Amino acid sequence: MFRTMMNGKIHRATVTEANLNYVGSITIDSAILEAVDMLPNEKVQIVNNNNGARIETYIIPGEPGSGVICLNGAAARHVQVGDVVIIMSYGMFTAEEAKTHEPKIVVLDEKNHIEMILPEEKAHTTL
């Protein structure tokens, strides 16, 4: 049996752009992607802390160090510039792999610079 587990998480990203007229996706600073082991075209779930929206799309890498978090296409309807979002990727693991899997988690500051890298997510973590 395979289990779907969180593989990477970008916590408290601030939306810098929303481009309704783009074909689709989310553009993410490629330095952030590298830190959480997310890849171009990988499926991600985005949770908007401001309005509760949850959407799925795929990643387009942005300029490294730019701090860009841009929702494109229809996804742009679910955010406003300045909204705080959580971006998560998932992977399929065997039951044995799932027991020891440790996702990569980064917490961003208000300018989308990596503030902290968490080795794991503890229950009742408050940031």
From Swiss-Prot:
Pathway: Cofactor biosynthesis; (R)-pantothenate biosynthesis; beta-alanine from L-aspartate: step 1/1. Substrate binds at residues 57, 73-75. One of its GO terms (biological process) is pantothenate biosynthetic process. Gene3D superfamilies: 2.40.40.20. It is an enzyme of class 4 (lyase). It is found in: Cytoplasm. This is Aspartate 1-decarboxylase. It comes from Listeria monocytogenes serotype 4a (strain HCC23). The gene is panD.
